[in-house]
Amino acid sequence: MSTDILRKIEAYKREEIAAAKARVALDELKARTRDQSAPRGFLKALEAKRAAGQFALIAEIKKASPSKGLIRPDFDPPALAKAYEEGGAACLSVLTDTPSFQGAPEFLTAARQACSLPALRKDFLFDPYQVYEARSWGADCILIIMASVDDDLAKELEDTAFALGMDALIEVHDEAEMERALKLSSRLLGVNNRNLRSFEVNLAVSERLAKMAPSDRLLVGESGIFTHEDCLRLEKSGIGTFLIGESLMRQHDVAAATRALLTGAEKL
């Protein structure tokens, strides 16, 4: 996403946030978070897969995207969540942004309720209010996109997530953002292989930025990962955790496609 697109997204997000605050006061939202069952442990689920010698997959539930349009016409979040779990995914990522991705909060809640996997709210966050929203919908983890927030806001979002018992996935796409991300406390770092200006995808981005991360961080490869071979390639750079959406969303048998991606087993 270009800087211009990120600016447009921030503009409509800030309108959304203002409207949401007018509908549900922060105190009411905080009360709703207390009604939720405890977070499931997003980072813990990823680490358990890696400790067992397996690739750890954050499997994404995504109906559409700004660049590709409609990705999955037959869109059933609970069924997709079950298929991902059956295929061996460690966690879910669910789009809740409506204008750009045709996502919705209900998709997150329904998907998480249909399985035992922890779930990430995949959205553009600009206000701690959205972290409370995420928890009130059942999310176990939030996404912080370093390209769209300054350091102070990134820390405020992270602190809010941690106070709610959630994890935070910090997304970077270049060296400068990686340096900023390493000042935060979260051990979960996502490297987006998509150039936000040209939209080009190159796995070499993950390979390059992986060298900057200390060994105590869990690196997540994002974008441009389509095959088991792609996973094996990134593993050579110390990345064994992946966030994958579109390539799996386009498959008829999502469980079999997930299994094939993770293990190299042929799809039946």
UniProtKB/Swiss-Prot annotation:
Documented EC number(s): 4.1.1.48
Pathway the protein contributes to: Amino-acid biosynthesis; L-tryptophan biosynthesis; L-tryptophan from chorismate: step 4/5
Keyword Lyase in record: yes
Swiss-Prot/TrEMBL GO biological process terms: L-tryptophan biosynthetic process
Organism: Brucella suis (strain ATCC 23445 / NCTC 10510)
Keyword Signal belongs to the record: no
Assigned keywords, A-Z: Amino-acid biosynthesis, Aromatic amino acid biosynthesis, Decarboxylase, Lyase, Tryptophan biosynthesis
Source taxon at top rank: Bacteria
Protein name as catalogued: Indole-3-glycerol phosphate synthase
GO molecular-function term, one example from the UniProt record: indole-3-glycerol-phosphate synthase activity
Catalysis performed (reactions): 1-(2-carboxyphenylamino)-1-deoxy-D-ribulose 5-phosphate + H(+) = (1S,2R)-1-C-(indol-3-yl)glycerol 3-phosphate + CO2 + H2O
Family, per entry: Belongs to the TrpC family.
